[in-house]
A protein has these predicted regions:
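Secretory targeting signatures
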Residues: 1-17
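Rhodanese-like catalytic fold shared by cysteine-dependent sulfurtransferases
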Residues: 2, 18-38, 46-79, 88-120
């Protein structure tokens, strides 16, 4: 009985790792030059933005981006570059903006890779 219980616990632990969901990966952009009229959007929290953000970036947290982007009078054809800490929230923002009709949204991934892409 003890061995069966141990086997069940080991199997449960192994299967728990299998159902954790897909791993997120973000491919950084290479050598980005912001075109005139493009908008650089930091989709992190206010606290993260206050600690560090890219020059020229505006803060619009990812969970409220579709509510706040119209306040910036952004044309739906404008180019929007979004970034966060790792690229995950920026990807959520990109999908939300695409669903709202914005088609030129580019995920710069995390702030470090975005900074590097813009500096090249």
């Amino acid at each position: 009985m003890r061995n069966v219980l141990l086997l069940v616990l080991v199997a449960a632990a192994l299967f728990a790792g299998c159902i954790s969901g897909p791993k997120f990966t973000c491919t950084p952009q290479r050598s980005v030059t912001l075109p005139k009229g493009a908008l650089l959007v930091d989709v992190r929290t206010q606290k993260e933005y206050d600690e560090k953000h890219l020059d020229g970036a505006i803060l619009i947290p990812h969970d409220s981006i579709t509510n706040h982007i119209p306040g910036f009078s952004v044309n739906r054809n404008a180019i929007l570059y979004v970034y966060c800490g790792t690229g995950r929230r920026a990807e959520k923002a990109l999908k939300a903006l695409n669903s709202a009709g914005y088609r030129n949204v580019i995920n710069l991934c995390g702030i470090k890779s975005a900074e590097k892409s813009l500096a090249e």
